[in-house]
Design a protein with these regions (language model features):
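N-terminal "mature-domain start" segment
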Residues: 20, 26-90, 161, 176-187
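Bacterial N-terminal signal peptides that target proteins for export
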Residues: 1-9
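C-terminal motif of bacterial Sec signal peptides marking the signal peptidase cleavage site
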Residues: 15-18
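Short Gly/Thr-rich strand-loop-strand
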Residues: 116-152
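A short acidic-to-branched-hydrophobic micro-motif
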Residues: 90-119, 162-166
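Extracellularly exposed regions in secreted/surface proteins, prominently low-complexity, repeat-rich
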Residues: 148-187
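Active-site beta-strand termini and strand-to-loop segments that position acidic
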Residues: 95-100, 145, 155-158
Length: 187
């Protein structure tokens, strides 16, 4: 099941995924196609002191996004902070990317308190709807959840639960892990 152009919503502790993910490619042979947005909205999570003096968009830079995706000629990067709708805290950055051939993507990075890490992880492990995968070699603990074909990487590190979502062509685990490494190297 895919819901075109929908937004992926990840809710702390309760983990609810509204219609999301799927869709576009990087566009080849001059065919530009748009990927759906994938901002992460951290609804009602405990307040956490944010890195980068609160400018979470410093998490990733243009150089962190692969420049060799087939059919593209480099990416133009615009960063947009998304305000938490419940607590009013600025917790999420959405990266608006446009390639030279018009393809677009909106990966995102959010920061949550680690207070509910164990319970949120158990919910993910027990879920029959969204495939869970343990991810070694990243932070103190990490796991991947696939929601409607959309990968979301959760990383526990440096006092944060870091939530990284990607949309095509940045949705594979190695790329999400490279984003996590870049973030952890800057915090």
């Amino acid at each position: 099941m895919r819901c075109k152009g929908a937004t992926l919503i990840v809710v702390s502790a309760a983990f609810v995924a509204a219609c999301g993910g799927g869709g576009g490619t990087a566009g080849g042979a001059g065919n530009a196609s748009a990927s759906p947005s994938a901002p992460i909205l951290n609804l009602g999570a405990p307040t956490v002191k944010l890195p980068f003096a609160g400018d979470v968009c410093q998490s990733l830079a243009a150089t962190d996004f692969p420049g060799d995706i087939a059919g593209t000629s480099g990416w133009t990067l615009t960063k947009t902070e998304v305000i938490d709708g419940m607590a009013g805290a600025k917790t999420v950055c959405r990266y608006d990317l446009t390639s030279g051939n018009g393809s677009t993507s909106q990966p995102g990075v959010g920061y949550e308190s680690v207070d509910n890490w164990d319970s949120a992880k158990q919910i993910a492990v027990k879920s029959t709807d969204n495939p869970y995968q343990a991810v070694p070699g990243v932070g103190e603990d990490a796991y991947l959840v696939n929601v409607f074909g959309q990968n979301v990487l959760y990383v526990k590190a440096k006092g944060y639960s870091i939530v990284i979502s990607g949309v095509d062509p940045f949705n594979d685990l190695p790329t999400l892990k490279s984003f996590a490494s870049a973030i952890l190297g800057r915090i």
